[in-house]
Amino acid sequence: MNPANNEKIDQMFDAIYKEAEKRRNEFREDPVPKIHIGLATCGIASGALETKKAFEDALEEYNVDARIHTVGCLGHCYAEPVVIIDHPDSGFPPIFYHEVNAGKAKMLTKLFLKEGDPRFEHVYGAMEENDLIPSVMEFTRFNREKRVVMEKCGHIDPEDIYDYIAEGGYSSLVKALKLNPDEIVKQVQNSGLRGRGGAGFPTGRKWELANSAGEQEKIVICNADEGDPGAYMDRTILESNPHQVIEGMAICAYAVGAKKAIIYVRAEYPLAVNIVTKAIRQATELGLLGESVLGSSFDLEIEVFRGSGAFVCGEETALIRSIEGYRGCPVTVRRIRFKKVCGTSPRSLTM
């Protein structure tokens, strides 16, 4: 990569990061209470939208100055609607409240935000170690977890790209753009990263095959289709941290030489579809997608494809047939086959 090009990439991203940092600092340094409300599908299904509206109405009714910060799924769906209240002037650490319906929202606004009584009977735990309230980290459900993929879920606003960038988002893409694609593939191979399916196919090997597939048009496909009853891992990530998925796809596309990518997600996930579509638009507006990503020679267009919800389309060959406009049925091919037809021209695909 040209050093002058690297400098341009750094300059463009630094300007974006400074804006993100400014917004984050303004939010954190604002002395008013912060109300964090989970608005992923699990929360909404439990009444989180009504909870949010109740907080908004109660803040106005009791003349309380506070900020509402919507986030994704914290991973504790059994406790929804989940609300975390950070009230600096109360002397208490940020508090995790569970099953906060509209009535509890009004009560907490009056008694805690206005009068300083945290109502311990509704407290699940504190979000920080302290001497007043048991920390959630003391509970088995928390202290045995080491979050990797979901580390930021439930802490950032999935509909605010600056929230993600302020937490280090897109910095890996910046690093990748300064490397040769072969170097990226080598790093992925050395990491030992594998697919989470039964075969556990090495990701680095898959990227290597796609990278070496020649000059034909290449497409990266994100398989976010889930047919197993009750499965919602992909939905949770797309709803709670969509830019993490987009950044990973961008790195993959750069490494294998693709200029187009598709997120295949079932139409039965309307919230995930809407959030990731908005995230793609935000990233494009900031120059993190589209033509000349961050001033580099790398172009990438990402689109969302809505699947019809067929169970079998979670299988990659059926998924590709669905994208092509055919009925989503598996076809008998080798486990990894990169020369396929998508539309009318030969292309190389990596999942």
Where are these regions (language model features)?
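Feature of Fe-S/electron-transfer and energy-metabolism proteins
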Residues: 1-351
